[in-house]
Protein backbone atom coordinates (compact mmCIF):
# COMPACT_ATOMS: atom_id res chain seq x y z
CA UNK A 1 0.00 0.00 0.00
CA UNK A 2 1.05 3.61 -0.36
CA UNK A 3 1.63 5.90 2.61
CA UNK A 4 2.97 9.39 3.21
CA UNK A 5 6.30 9.30 5.02
CA UNK A 6 8.57 11.97 6.47
CA UNK A 7 12.02 10.37 5.97
CA UNK A 8 13.74 13.32 7.67
CA UNK A 9 12.66 16.79 8.81
CA UNK A 10 11.71 18.96 5.85
CA UNK A 11 11.14 16.05 3.44
CA UNK A 12 7.97 14.19 2.41
CA UNK A 13 7.62 11.13 0.17
CA UNK A 14 5.07 8.54 -0.84
CA UNK A 15 6.40 5.12 0.06
CA UNK A 16 5.20 1.61 -0.73
CA UNK A 17 4.84 -0.46 2.48
CA UNK A 18 3.09 -3.69 3.36
CA UNK A 19 -0.61 -3.64 4.19
CA UNK A 20 -0.97 -3.93 7.98
CA UNK A 21 -2.13 -7.16 9.59
CA UNK A 22 -4.79 -6.93 12.30
CA UNK A 23 -4.96 -8.80 15.59
CA UNK A 24 -8.06 -10.17 17.32
CA UNK A 25 -9.08 -6.76 18.72
CA UNK A 26 -8.45 -4.63 15.64
CA UNK A 27 -10.11 -3.67 12.38
CA UNK A 28 -8.57 -2.83 9.01
CA UNK A 29 -9.97 0.38 7.53
CA UNK A 30 -9.61 1.38 3.86
CA UNK A 31 -8.95 5.11 3.91
CA UNK A 32 -11.45 7.28 2.05
CA UNK A 33 -10.70 10.74 3.50
CA UNK A 34 -7.83 12.44 5.28
CA UNK A 35 -7.27 15.95 6.61
CA UNK A 36 -4.04 17.78 7.25
CA UNK A 37 -3.67 18.76 10.91
CA UNK A 38 -1.71 21.98 11.15
CA UNK A 39 -0.96 21.40 14.84
CA UNK A 40 0.52 17.95 14.27
CA UNK A 41 1.45 17.18 10.67
CA UNK A 42 3.12 20.48 9.85
CA UNK A 43 5.23 20.28 13.02
CA UNK A 44 6.22 16.67 12.30
CA UNK A 45 7.29 17.65 8.78
CA UNK A 46 9.30 20.57 10.12
CA UNK A 47 10.93 18.43 12.82
CA UNK A 48 9.42 20.58 15.57
CA UNK A 49 6.88 18.28 17.22
CA UNK A 50 7.69 17.97 20.95
CA UNK A 51 9.07 14.56 21.90
CA UNK A 52 9.34 13.23 18.35
CA UNK A 53 12.85 12.89 17.01
CA UNK A 54 12.87 9.47 15.33
CA UNK A 55 12.53 9.36 11.55
CA UNK A 56 11.23 8.10 9.17
CA UNK A 57 7.67 8.45 10.43
CA UNK A 58 4.22 8.13 8.95
CA UNK A 59 1.86 11.12 8.84
CA UNK A 60 -1.82 11.57 9.50
CA UNK A 61 -4.26 11.08 12.34
CA UNK A 62 -7.40 12.71 10.93
CA UNK A 63 -8.78 10.03 8.66
CA UNK A 64 -11.97 8.16 7.86
CA UNK A 65 -12.82 5.12 5.83
CA UNK A 66 -14.67 1.85 5.54
CA UNK A 67 -13.99 -1.26 7.60
CA UNK A 68 -12.79 -4.06 5.31
CA UNK A 69 -11.76 -6.69 7.90
CA UNK A 70 -12.23 -7.26 11.63
CA UNK A 71 -10.47 -9.43 14.18
CA UNK A 72 -12.42 -12.29 15.74
CA UNK A 73 -12.90 -10.45 19.07
CA UNK A 74 -14.03 -7.09 17.67
CA UNK A 75 -17.46 -6.19 19.07
CA UNK A 76 -18.08 -2.62 17.95
CA UNK A 77 -17.61 -2.85 14.19
CA UNK A 78 -18.42 -5.01 11.23
CA UNK A 79 -17.19 -5.08 7.65
CA UNK A 80 -18.85 -2.27 5.72
CA UNK A 81 -19.10 0.17 8.64
CA UNK A 82 -17.66 3.63 8.15
CA UNK A 83 -15.18 4.55 10.85
CA UNK A 84 -12.91 7.34 11.98
CA UNK A 85 -9.77 6.70 13.95
CA UNK A 86 -7.39 8.61 16.13
CA UNK A 87 -3.82 7.71 16.83
CA UNK A 88 -2.72 4.29 15.70
CA UNK A 89 -0.96 2.33 18.41
CA UNK A 90 1.38 0.52 16.02
CA UNK A 91 1.74 1.66 12.42
CA UNK A 92 3.14 -1.75 11.54
CA UNK A 93 5.45 -0.80 8.67
CA UNK A 94 8.98 -2.10 9.02
CA UNK A 95 11.48 0.72 9.35
CA UNK A 96 8.85 3.41 9.96
CA UNK A 97 8.36 4.78 13.45
CA UNK A 98 5.03 6.40 14.19
CA UNK A 99 1.85 6.44 16.20
CA UNK A 100 0.14 7.97 13.19
CA UNK A 101 -0.28 6.64 9.65
CA UNK A 102 -3.66 8.05 8.64
CA UNK A 103 -2.29 9.12 5.24
CA UNK A 104 -2.10 5.45 4.24
CA UNK A 105 -4.35 3.45 1.95
CA UNK A 106 -5.22 1.23 4.94
CA UNK A 107 -4.99 1.76 8.69
CA UNK A 108 -5.32 -0.56 11.66
CA UNK A 109 -7.61 0.64 14.44
CA UNK A 110 -8.29 -0.78 17.88
CA UNK A 111 -11.88 -1.81 18.60
CA UNK A 112 -12.05 0.36 21.73
CA UNK A 113 -10.55 3.53 20.17
CA UNK A 114 -12.55 4.06 16.99
CA UNK A 115 -15.83 5.85 16.30
CA UNK A 116 -18.39 4.93 13.70
Residue ranges and their predicted role:
Residues 4-12:
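Extracellular beta-rich ligand/substrate-recognition surface
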Residues 1-2, 15, 81, 105:
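Extracytoplasmic/periplasmic beta-strand context in beta-sandwich domains
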Residues 20-36, 48-92, 99-101:
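Glycine-rich beta-strand-centered segment in the early N-terminal region that forms part
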Residues 38-45:
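Cytochrome P450 core scaffold surrounding the K-helix E-X-X-R motif
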Amino acid sequence: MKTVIVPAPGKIEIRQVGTPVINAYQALVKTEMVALCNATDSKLIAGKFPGVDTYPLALGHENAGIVVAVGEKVRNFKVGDRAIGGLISDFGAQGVDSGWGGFSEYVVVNDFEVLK
